């Protein structure tokens, strides 16, 4: 629930038990990034991540060695990174299609609601740490592609962060242009499968792919207005 609206968080349509291989195939990889049809809703790709919607066995936490990473290092997504480490050691996960927790988010106090001038650099650290996990655990090409998609989708969060800054419009567009022309992002957009996206997201990420920073900025201002209603 936010200040202006309330909605149910539905991940799977029914109670589901995931055994070891299904945990890897259907859950663990999603903490790295979206694939296939999951890309059709970029705004929902991290719905699985919050720790407030989960109960963990202490033994699993101890087995995984997972710890929350300081937001000063990775900017955001501390829940998702924690789950990436935990679910990598999970042999069985049960999803309950029931509402057991009412979570209220006060936008004015959220760590993601204000401008963060370090967010770009912090997210590069997050991506580097994810790459290290993929390499050290030999998770393979699917995980690499999922991370590639996360990087590409990330211009939404980075761009919204820029739009709420007090900088001039020209400086905001310049900052967006600098990001989408970075080699890491150019590679990500080159491999992003846009055919999964609905038309409005296809337009947004198409602008990013082609380096059209003003188009990205214009669409971000529309998105920001919708969010702020």
Indicate where each model-derived feature is located:
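Residue-level "edge-of-site" marker
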Residues: 74, 99, 193
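Alpha-helix N-cap/helix-start motif at coil-to-helix transitions, marked by capping-box chemistry
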Residues: 50, 55, 121-124, 149
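Membrane-interface aromatic/basic loop that binds lipid-linked glycans or pyrophosphate carriers
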Residues: 10-11, 132, 163-229
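Donor-binding/catalytic cores of nucleotide-activated saccharide
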Residues: 1-94, 103-105, 109-117
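All-alpha amphipathic helical-bundle segments outside canonical DNA-binding/catalytic cores
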Residues: 140-149
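Amphipathic alpha-helical repeat scaffolds of TPR domains
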Residues: 148-160
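Catalytic core of nucleotide-sugar-dependent glycosyltransferases
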Residues: 98-107, 113-141, 157, 161-186
């Amino acid at each position: 629930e936010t200040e202006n609206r309330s909605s149910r968080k539905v991940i799977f349509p029914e109670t589901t038990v995931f055994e070891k291989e299904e945990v890897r195939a259907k859950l663990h990889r999603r903490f790295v990034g979206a694939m296939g049809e999951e890309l059709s809703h970029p705004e929902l790709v991290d719905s699985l991540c919050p720790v407030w919607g989960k109960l963990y066995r202490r033994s699993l936490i101890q087995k995984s060695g997972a710890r929350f990473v300081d937001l000063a290092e990775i900017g955001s997504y501390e829940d998702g990174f924690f789950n990436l480490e935990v679910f990598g050691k999970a042999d069985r996960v049960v999803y309950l299609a029931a509402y057991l927790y009412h979570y209220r988010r006060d936008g004015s106090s959220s760590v993601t609601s204000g401008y963060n001038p370090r967010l770009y650099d912090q997210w590069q650290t997050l991506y580097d740490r994810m790459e290290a996990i993929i390499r050290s655990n030999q998770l393979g090409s699917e995980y690499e592609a999922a991370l590639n998609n996360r990087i590409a989708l990330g211009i939404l969060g980075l761009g919204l962060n820029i739009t709420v800054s007090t900088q001039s419009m020209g400086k905001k567009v310049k900052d967006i242009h600098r990001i989408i022309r970075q080699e890491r992002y150019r590679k990500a957009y080159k491999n992003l499968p846009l055919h999964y996206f609905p038309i409005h997201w296809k337009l947004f990420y198409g602008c990013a792919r082609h380096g059209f920073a003003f188009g990205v900025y214009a669409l971000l201002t529309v998105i920001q207005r919708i969010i702020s209603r």
